[in-house]
Amino acid sequence: MRNAQGESWHSSELKFGDLGDFKLENGAVIRDCRIAYHTSGKLNDDKSNVVLWPTWFTGSSKQLIPLAGSDGYVDPSRYFVIFVDALGNGISSSPSNSSVQPRMEFPVFTIRDMVNSQYRLLTENLGINHIHAVMGISMGGMQTFQWIVSYPEFMDKAVAIVGSPRLTAYDMLLWRAEESAIREDKDWNGGVADVAPRLFGFCRTDENQARSVDGAGSDRRPCEFGRGTLFALTFGVGKTNSSSKNSQKMPQTDAQLVYSAPNRM
């Protein structure tokens, strides 16, 4: 494995941590829940050099690996980096890959649930009870803020990069516009269409002109974070009423104001 600077180090193949039936904060359960991850670097004997790096919106753990290095965000020659796929990204348990709760049968989940699943991965599957740092970019930053709130003593440092505890009004407007584009597709059929509308580039409305501006050029299938977004509506994160008054809130964390420190570790 080589990073963006051309440096080479060992990086694990994609691994999965099995959580069994994972209970969510709303009381629902993700059956046979699995969390995917890659690792880079060497774990110290006392496990004191762990850095957890959750994915951004539409991101995968594999896409994070090239961002590490001696001139990157974190140096695997010093730290054992765990790049973790967030719930719903199409690699960890998601509406698109669940055999027991596919599409609209998949339960509603939150940023807090993502963090709780990562906590269980670390403590139950990997035997890690304290980490040096948690860090994340964009929605990974949102997860970082939630880590600070949910497990403040679990890490020594928290680094949120271009992330915020809550979505802005602009973000919410963007998702609502894309949600409308999905719902207006003639094949929508309440989220159980045989072929989902395209989420990147042009959405498949009757006129095929609704343009999605987030994630253009992605080389992998769309991710499905939260409920009430275009991803949720296409792949079915829970059962969603189509009326606007019943639309779900966008993902957000418990955190209100926490300082971020995007310095290199």
Task: Give each language-model segment a name.
Residues L173, E178-M265:
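Alpha/beta-hydrolase
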Residues I30-K42:
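A short loop-to-beta-strand scaffold at the N-terminal edge of the catalytic core in hydrolase folds
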Residues A4-E25, I35-Y37:
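A domain-start/cap signature at the N-terminus of enzymes
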Residues N26-C33, E207-V213:
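Short, polar loop/linker segments at the starts of domains and inter-domain junctions
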Residues K47-F57:
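Short beta-strand element of the alpha/beta-hydrolase
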Residues A4, F22, C33, G59-G69, ...:
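Alpha/beta-hydrolase-fold serine-hydrolase catalytic core, especially in secreted/extracellular enzymes
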Residues K42-D45, N125:
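Surface-exposed acidic, glycine-flexible loop patches that form ligand/cofactor-binding
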Residues T58-M142, V149, E153-P165, Y170-L174:
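Gly/Pro-rich cap/lid or specificity-loop segments adjacent to the active site
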